Amino acid sequence: MPEWALYALAAVAGYLSGSIPFGLVIVKAAGLGDIREIGSKSIGATNVLRTGRKDLALATFLLDSLKAGLVALAFTLLAGREVGFVAGFAAFIGHCYPVWLGFKGGKGIATYAGLLAFVSPLHGLVVAAPVWLGLFALTRISSLAALTAAVAVPPGAWLMGERNSLILAGLALLSVFVFWTHRENIGRLLKGTEPRFGAKKKDAPEA
């Protein structure tokens, strides 16, 4: 198969995998209604947590991670790390803009985590995870932790010796997308109104 065809196949497969709306399916299966009518209306794990079911939120996070990670791993084994990264990147896009839901999906953090875990695990473990966990522990603001981790990954990967231009460019572009999908959160962060985990509902706007 020509190289361009492998990249195209990876992109299509990744997008279709990423566009599976696990959050929507899980919440409906649990009899809790349409997640798109709850909280921020996002299909991601953070919004699923607003149903009060931590188990459903965890399941959503894991499945959203795997739908990017497994397709990325499959194409990495089939055609190399660059093609695998393209598949995972496309899964991120599919999650954020699923064709089945009118291109209105989640914010991409779980799929980003899945991509890192299966294609660049060292960058995820050494850079993304400690930054997210550390900042979340300090602030209890999930969006701030996610945005900071997204910013840290590209330079962190470079400092750790990553020199593949496609991977570095892709990581930088993913950071841009994360900021875009979190633009409403950024607005609230600037106003000081972004909710913290554990805050009383009456004091916490929708994230």
UniProtKB/Swiss-Prot annotation:
The keyword Transmembrane helix applies. It catalyses: an acyl phosphate + sn-glycerol 3-phosphate = a 1-acyl-sn-glycero-3-phosphate + phosphate. GO terms for biological process: phospholipid biosynthetic process. It is an enzyme of class 2 (transferase). GO terms for cellular component: plasma membrane. Keywords: Cell inner membrane, Cell membrane, Lipid biosynthesis, Lipid metabolism, Membrane, Phospholipid biosynthesis, Phospholipid metabolism, Transferase, Transmembrane, Transmembrane helix. Its EC number is 2.3.1.275. Pathway: Lipid metabolism; phospholipid metabolism. The chain crosses the membrane at residues 7-27, 58-78, 83-103, 116-136, 141-161, 166-186. Pfam families: G3P_acyltransf. It is found in: Cell inner membrane. It comes from the Bacteria. It is a multi-pass membrane protein. One of its GO terms (molecular function) is acyl-phosphate glycerol-3-phosphate acyltransferase activity. InterPro entries: G3P_acylTferase_PlsY. Catalyzes the transfer of an acyl group from acyl-phosphate (acyl-PO(4)) to glycerol-3-phosphate (G3P) to form lysophosphatidic acid (LPA). This enzyme utilizes acyl-phosphate as fatty acyl donor, but not acyl-CoA or acyl-ACP. NCBIfam families: glycerol-3-phosphate 1-O-acyltransferase PlsY. Probably interacts with PlsX. Belongs to the PlsY family. This is Glycerol-3-phosphate acyltransferase. It comes from Hyphomonas neptunium (strain ATCC 15444). The lineage of its organism: Bacteria, Pseudomonadati, Pseudomonadota, Alphaproteobacteria, Hyphomonadales.
